[in-house]
A protein has these predicted regions:
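Hydrophobic alpha-helical segments characteristic of transmembrane helices
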Residues: 1-51, 235, 242-248, 367, ...
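Membrane-embedded transport module
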Residues: 3, 7, 263-309, 324, ...
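Bateman (tandem CBS) regulatory domains
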Residues: 18-22, 98-101, 209-217, 232-237, ...
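Cytosolic catalytic regions of ATP/NTP-dependent phosphoryl-transfer enzymes
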Residues: 63-213, 219, 232-233, 241, ...
């Protein structure tokens, strides 16, 4: 409006001045911003999908770039989720094999079921006919496994077979305290080697107390080969990784160390009942954690100012996934409920995919900052050139052959610059690759898109381009003529935009 009034004052009321003012108004507003922003997000989400990370909520893209803590499950995320029995330690191997088959919901023929139970069946099938054993000893009643009691019971005509965590079954054995303590120590020693230790027991009728010990099953779920490198990359990026698992503390610590995670401080679900929020922040590995306790871990980390990405696969994980800044669900073994509330779904259930998603999230954010810096700096330079150019032409008395005031750029030139040399480079910047994004710490969650350095870039480059263009407009008319000076100014502005795109 000010330039329109200035034009009327100097040039008089004319259609040329109005057209020029309208063109400048169009150029001053970055109308291509919504399209470029949408394209940047869409292409970034598409790149994530190619890397097996499906974004369910676009807000997660921004949050991924700010993640400071990843709270990850162990089984299937850090490990291959392929349980194989390494050894059966039993005083009664025949009955222990029956327990492995009968206290089991998996189906070996179809491969359906929990990976641990499938591993038990694969091992038992070496020594007996699984289907024949199940036909001869039908299930009469059962108590399904639950994270609250940590064991499963199945009653058959032979009696009750139980399998579960050592700490859940050993106290139920008909053994003196000294013998129970020895079994606890033995289970802990095996777990410290990275084995998942499963206890087996037998009881008469439907008894769950006074049981007979059938032995330990040692299973191994090897870490995914790509996880150690992914952990190293994300730690270098300033993101802390903590393990949250339902497994034995010693097993969890062994796996954490094997993949390169910190594992100095280990706490169990029972410890969480007494730990303060400040003490909780120091824990590296959370073991024997119930799903509902994940929510408290997330809230304590967020209370300390952390931006948390939490993984989960069960129905009971939903509150923690919803509360986390980035809820990450498993696409292969996750429940429908967990996938519904999550912000990000891992198609391969792989920890390395979380790191890839964080890398893409940071890259998308940096690209948005780049094209914002570019668009605002170019728009600022155009406004300054036109506004100050009119003043300069009026002061120097620069007029064309028809006696009209020499404008720095014509309306058509302004629109051409705005369409071609503003919009297209901005689109290119939205697709830029940023290979070093994981070499820097996470950005603060509340940091603005145009931060201090970005604003300085906009002001300095905008003023520099405008100053150089005005210099051409001031000195060239005497040497090459008014029209050539105007043309040179236009070409400088057009080519200069492309040059400064590299600096954005």
């Amino acid at each position: 409006l000010g330039l329109l009034l200035l034009g009327f004052l100097v040039e008089g009321v004319s259609a040329k001045v109005v057209l020029f003012a309208v063109a400048l108004a169009v150029a001053a507003v970055p109308e291509g911003l919504p399209a470029v922003l949408t394209l940047a997000l869409a292409l970034g989400v598409e790149r994530m999908a190619r890397r097996k990370a499906v974004v369910r909520r676009l807000s997660a893209v921004e949050a991924l770039g700010s993640v400071t803590v990843i709270a990850t499950d162990k089984t299937g995320t850090l490990t291959e989720n392929r349980m194989e029995v390494q050894e059966l330690l039993s005083p009664d191997p025949e009955k222990a094999l029956l327990a492995m088959v009968l206290c089991n919901d998996a189906d070996l023929a179809t491969g359906a079921g929990d990976p641990l139970e499938l591993g038990l069946l694969r091992y038992a099938s070496r020594f007996l006919d699984v289907e024949r054993v199940r036909r001869e000893h039908p299930r009469l009643s059962e108590r399904p496994f639950d994270s609250a009691w940590k064991f499963m019971r199945v009653t058959t005509p032979l009696g009750s077979f139980l399998k579960g965590a050592p700490e859940a079954l050993i106290p139920r054995l008909a053994l003196p305290q000294e013998e129970q303590a020895r079994l606890f120590e033995e289970a802990g020693a095996h777990a410290a080697k990275g084995f998942r230790v499963l206890a087996l027991a037998f009881g008469e009728g439907e008894r769950e107390e006074g049981l007979r010990f059938l032995g330990f099953v040692l299973l191994l779920d090897p870490p995914r080969p790509e996880v150690p490198e992914a952990v190293a990359r994300v730690l270098k990026a300033g993101v802390r990784v903590v393990m949250v698992t339902g497994d034995h503390p010693a097993t969890a610590r062994a796996i954490a160390r094997r993949v390169g995670m910190p594992a100095e401080v280990v706490a169990t679900g029972e410890d969480l009942e007494t730990l303060s929020d400040e003490e909780l922040l120091k824990v590296d590995v959370f073991a024997r954690v119930r799903p509902e306790q994940k929510l408290r871990i997330v809230e304590a980390l967020q209370k300390a100012g952390e931006v948390v990405a939490m993984t989960g696969d069960g129905v009971n994980d939903a509150p923690a996934l919803k509360r986390a800044d980035v809820g990450v669900a498993m696409g292969q073994r996750g429940s429908d409920v967990s996938r519904e509330v999550a912000d990000l779904v891992l198609l391969d259930d792989n920890f390395a995919t979380i790191v890839a998603a964080i890398e893409e999230g940071r890259s998308i954010y940096e690209n948005i900052q780049k094209f914002l810096r570019f668009l605002f700096s170019t728009n600022l330079s155009e406004v300054l050139v036109v506004a100050l150019g009119m003043v300069l032409a009026a002061l120097l008395g620069l007029r064309d052959e028809a006696g009209h005031l020499l404008l720095p750029l014509t309306a058509v030139q302004i629109l051409w610059i705005n369409l071609v040399t503003d919009g297209l480079p901005a689109l290119a910047l939205s697709l830029d690759r940023n290979p070093g994004v994981l070499d820097r710490p996470p950005r603060p969650k509340e940091s603005p898109l145009l931060d201090g350095p970005s604003l300085r870039f906009v002001l300095l480059t905008g003023a520099l381009k405008a100053g150089l263009a005005l210099g051409l407009l001031g000195f060239l008319p005497g040497a090459v003529g008014l029209e050539a000076a105007q043309s040179a100014t236009f070409h400088f502005m057009a080519i200069g935009q492309l040059f400064f795109a590299y600096a954005a």
